[in-house]
Amino acid sequence: MKFLKIFFLILFLLPSTLLANGHKLEEQNLKVVDSFWANILSNPDVAMELIHEDFEFEFMGICEICKKYNKETYESTWLNEVIPAVLPNGITLNITNRIAGGDMVVFTIEGEADGINGEYNNNYAMVMRLKDKKIIFFQEYMSDLLAETRLHKKKIVDID
């Protein structure tokens, strides 16, 4: 009888312990990603410390700057060449939602900027996966049509 009580006690406590540890991981991952977004534009060296050595970034969509980058090219090319060229006055990022589940974190963000061809106020879904308390995978989803027309002087043409 005593064995059964201990067995059921363990059976009852184990799932809640596992669930609590899952929440700790999610909270920890949110802190990493919060710090990344707090620093990426103003203090990129701090943000880059939060990126895993095997990092992969992809600006999703079909556009001139929609490409894949690794840790080195994310900093040297994306942050130091691509973004300054198309957003010479910078961009303001307003976080609207934060979602974490397991090793994944998703932020939705509203951007406000003037692109080289006019107002560029795009909405983003930033999908990140973490490993060893660092960001290892990052896909940035946005309106590639808006990116093309405001950042690259492309025009929409009627086909009629």
PLM feature spans:
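A beta-strand edge to alpha-helix "cap/lid" segment located at domain peripheries
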Residues: A20-K24, L41, L79-D160
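Residues that line or immediately flank small-molecule/substrate-binding pockets and catalytic motifs
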Residues: F8-L11, D54, E58-F59, G102, ...
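A solvent-exposed, acidic/Ser-Thr-rich amphipathic alpha-helical stretch
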Residues: H52-A100
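Short, low-complexity N-terminal intrinsically disordered segments enriched in polar/charged residues
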Residues: F3-L4, F8-L41, D45-E49, K153-D160
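Short amphipathic alpha-helical "recognition" segments used for binding
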Residues: I6-L9, E75, L79, S143-D144
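N-terminal/domain-start segments enriched in small and hydrophobic, helix-friendly residues
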Residues: N29-L30, F36-N43, F55-F57, C63, ...
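Hydrophobic pocket/interface hotspot
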Residues: V33-F36, V46-M48, F55, Y74, ...
